[in-house]
UniProtKB/Swiss-Prot annotation:
Highest taxon above the source species: Eukaryota
Keyword Hydrolase: yes
EC class of the enzyme, as a word: hydrolase
Annotated keywords: Endoplasmic reticulum, Glycoprotein, Glycosidase, Hydrolase, Signal
Organism from which the protein derives: Schizosaccharomyces pombe (strain 972 / ATCC 24843) (Fission yeast)
Complex and partners: Heterodimer of a catalytic subunit alpha (gls2) and a subunit beta (gtb1).
Protein name stated in the entry: Glucosidase 2 subunit alpha
Disulfide links within the chain: none
Cited CDD domains: GH31_GANC_GANAB_alpha (cd06603), GH31_N (cd14752)
E.C. number(s) listed in UniProt: 3.2.1.207
Amino acid sequence: MRYHGICWFIFQAAIIFAIFGSCQGAFRHQFKTAEQDGFARRNRDLAKFQKENLNWNGLFQLNSISYNSGVVSGVFEQQSENGENQHLFPFSISFLKNDVVRFQMDEKSRLEGTVEYEKNILTKRRFDASTELGFNERAEVYGKDAHLLEQTSTSLTIRYGSHGRFTVIVTFSPFKVEFQRDGEPQVVLNERHLLNMEYYRPKSSRTPEQEANGMWDETFDNFHDSKPKGPESVGLDIKFVDYGNVYGVPEHTSSLSLKETNNSDAGYTEPYRLYNVDLFEYEVDSPMSQYGAIPFMQAHKPNSDVAVFWSNAAATWIDVEKESGPSPHSQSTSTHWYSESGTLDLFIFLGPKASDVYESYSALVGRPLLPPLFSIGYHQCRWNYVSEEDVLNVDAKFDEVDMPYDTIWLDIEYASKRRYFTWDKATFPNPKAMLEKLDSKSRKLIVILDPHIKNDPNYFVSKELIDYNYAVKDKSGVDNYNADCWPGNSVWVDFFNPEAQAWWGSLYEFDRFESDKNLWIWNDMNEPSVFRGPETSMHRDAIHYGGWEHRDIHNIYGHKCINGTYNGLIKRGEGAVRPFILTRSFFAGTSALAANWIGDTMTTWEHLRGSIPTVLTNGISGMAFSGADVAGFFGNPDAELFVRWYETAIFYPFFRAHAHIDTKRREPWLYGEPYTSLVRELLRIRYRLLPTWYTAFYNSHTHGFPILYPQFLMHPEDEEGFAIDDQFYVGDSGLLVKPVTHPSIDKITIYLADDEVYFDLHDHTEYAGKGHQVVPAPLGRVPVLLRGGNILITRERIRRAAELTRNDPFTLTIAVSKIGKNASGFLYLDDGVTFNYKKGEYLIRHFSYENGILTMKDSHSNPPVSPKYSSSQKHLKVERINIYGEQTRKSIKIRKIIDSEVTEWDVSVDDSGCIRNPQLFLV
């Protein structure tokens, strides 16, 4: 079937669209729709053809298949369009550790290098993102838990998994792979026969029809893409059986539960797109690309989760469609994934719980980082603080108005002529002295350093980059890729060259960049952003080290940039100190290296609302340390929006105020009273909760969990909450947050998923009963409820900066459950700075309350506890205990269990439910 011919009509329509554009979004015309992206158009046409020809069995036939030692191996074959040649595609289905299955497919001719390109500098094989990113090292085949149950002439069945609950059924013709759990289908590959891998064609064989379909070159927005390797897209349909809600594939401003992309009333007309771009003043509620790309999708139904990870670094689109499920009144979700180039590399996770999915997925791509303590405090930024005097005045003003904060940031104007790794000495004559003054208060400075380098022979970074041949090349493969960015004419670091990445890291050394130990890094514009480039980015036919076109690696360019920065900062700190990096661009695994923010928001209520599902989606997809600019990057918020955004942002994992250079100054005291006092108290709430936040980050680091739990994750059985994305929990602390995101209201409705009792964190009011509850929400009071059955751990003493709290005592707030009158919680502690926690220098204390007994237990796990560190923390204690939900209790027993030694004593409870100075020390 010559599927390329199907799209001729759509191609003509795309030309009309390109001429007349769209009236939605001020800059939408700069970015491709699926119909304007040749490979996307071809794959969507394939899907359209399948719907119109239901008896069609796909492009491929099975040539051979076998099973041995945990791997199904086989070969597909496909006839060329003229019927003269047979093309072979080896594939495998591998059974890995952690109950993960991997489906891979490649193209024999490119894999073996028998193809011929006009440019000999190009690598002949397809790009393998998993190899480049180190995923293969963690994707170990583990055949011990995989057993061939049956092989016939038509199918092959394998049982796998540590508990033997999972089954894979491979049907030979037409080819289909069904994944079952406990005998029930969960995920099906190629049910619609949309498996596609465009085979190599000599350019001399091209036809006018292929030219029209963008197979050999394309022009968009007057930018020409030469496509010297011809068509090489990959595609596959993936069905989530009996799952009506799917989540993930950030970064988008869509809802948490992904919408359909088939023109349905509640959905979109475009697929979700993964192509990292510099998208300013972006639309809310859109499947358009943003700054990051994680091709991870999770499906959820009552008490069941599955997921897939599509390991591909090229431009990718995902169609989502709902259909009737196998159960009465149920839905299944059919998805169609297609990427411009690369291999087909899919990982399948069958849960059954979300925690199982996150454990296995993060073990593959890398656990989220455990950040330094200061970085989960408050960050003050704008474009730009204009001088040392400006920086130090802002710093002093925070102390004057008694507001805590941890970092102040410098945007591009600090650097001489925007030449990174330099200082404008007219405005920053003595940066080290400035850093020392900040350090005296345990505060940090974070500066922007972007991967575009001013093309200037008198600039040492530019000279070295060019002299060492470390820059990205244009399509010739000889000349450096030159274009404009913030410094004017620029060249870009080629982070795919290991030597270039190491050189980039060396620029952070103290003898190369005038700085100090309390200076950390912001890598922006690393999509990469290119002014007046195609779709605000680099030409897809630019060439990177190794002979890869930019199209092959685009979505991981930012990740490789961050990898170089991270390694450089590790070396700068002699391997002892945890770095802090903020990135705008990201991919799967970037969370092991950096935090991110969601880019150039606008100061509107709509953008405030949209930030919540975006941050939630980033989190469940692995990018846990995420946040949005307070109170929007573009524009000047009124006082109400300003305060409401702070109310929301104190519950982002990453909490930073930032604003455009053309906005009015908006440090948190500039709106005057009563707003200054309102924001002050909001900042203090964030700092009181630092122990809770840090413990949530520890859980994320050790298990891959998000920092913020969506409703479906906290209440996996409650179908009413599966699509809720305007409220969330802070880790497993029991804190339920419902930000106010509309103007002129003083109360809000919170959805409670169960009959448990919930306590208002502000005045301890009790709410109970499944359903919607109305709670007060005057300006400055963010609605936060503490769910019964939890123990909240805080530090009530407010210091200038987070690190200054490390010796302060703790407060326990015990919210007893409705049934059983019990509660639990736990606390993680380390020095908040170094990697010494890997040597056992940390404390974990588990608290439980039942029958009037509060038990504190040492829950330290591997590596063994460091006696020296433990001894150094003997001063830490609980100074106060609050009990909610047991108004009549007059005393409780405290039980302390450390190293199997049990100590008990009784303490009195006053009429307010408070125990002061209970003499409970952590060690």
